[in-house]
Amino acid sequence: KKKKKLCYLEALKSGTTCVMDMFRFMDRCADAAGEIGLRVNLAPYVADQPGKDFFATRDENKRLIKTRHGSQQGRIKVWMGLEHLFYCSEDAYRDAVRCQREYGVRIHTHACEQKEEEAAVLAHFGRRSIGMLDHYGLLGENTLLAHCVWLNDDEIKRLADTGTAIAHCPVSNAKLASGVARTPEMLAAGIALGIGTDGPVCNNSLDMFEEMKFASLIQKATRLDVTALPADQILRMATIGGAKALGLDKEIGSIEVGKKADLVMLDLAMPNLTPHEVTNDGGNLLWNLVFAARGSNVSRVWVDGRCLIENGRSTQVDEARVLETAQQCGVSLYERCRAMSHLRVDMV
């Protein structure tokens, strides 16, 4: 819970109002989200293969749906979570599909993140990842796949045809040397595509402004095309695109009559956002938001009409206490890790 309060606070202070969170200890995550005020979709790391018992179980996932789904005035949603094809049995995938229909929830899992992963999946199962998920009945408009870096043309078409959504995590994919996802082709095919950070372990930051900028620049650089993934497409992916990927586009993701008041305000009187031009057609605000803004420019944030960040500070929790507690926990964790020299790996 202490770690999650830190993560949710960082996300909220940098202008994120809604997250998809796949992790363990989901009851504590729900409690932390309730305290911070963030809108959170929870998907437990579920695995049932031998040797993977440190992950959550299917029974825990179902209990969480029954006890937490729709809590905090509807801000907490619980999904069926599945870690990966090598961690979950066929029965786990098919059970998730059954539960999705029975409980009216959604499904989240990882797919096609690394080139070596795809080769291993093909060698083990005789199909690529998307083919296996399709075989298990997982693809569809209620499923969100993380990463999808190594999709071919047929797989992009299949995901588009089934309405399967993708969480695009460009900084994580770059840091872990996973590759560069084919986001322009995904968008052209009509796939619901949102932008994600993947979390502090694989990214070191939860700043969506950083993620937006990098998502555009990595496409321009690798394609040698300055027009690739322009600012307007990026902003849509980070707002209404993400809402659609989460199945929440009727409630959030844009400022419209009847939608929830999830809003972010930036202080434009900052060096990195000056000069700025505000006109009826937007002026240079779009480019400033995507290529110049940072999470530290956020001054106010509302979720469900409640002001959770005022003048850059949380209105719900004692930030100093959250940081102090997280610092103590972090130092303790570092010390324990140093004692396990046989598990030590080079930091990247």
Where would I find each of the regions flagged by the language model?
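Alpha-helical scaffold segments that flank or form the walls of functional sites
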Residues: 1-37, 59-71, 327-332, 338
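Divalent metal-coordination and catalytic microenvironments
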Residues: 15, 33, 80, 110, ...
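Active-site glycine- and acidic-residue-rich loops that bind
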Residues: 20-23, 79-95, 174-177, 245-247
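Metal-coordinating catalytic core of metallo-dependent amide/deamination hydrolases
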Residues: 28-150
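Histidine/acidic-residue-rich catalytic or RNA/ligand-binding cores of hydrolases
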Residues: 115-127, 155-160, 177-186, 203-220, ...
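His/Asp/Glu-enriched, well-ordered alpha-helical/loop segment
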Residues: 135-142, 184-272
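Long hydrophobic segments that form regular secondary structure
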Residues: 151, 155-164, 169-175, 183, ...
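Active-site microenvironment of metallo-dependent hydrolases
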Residues: 239-348
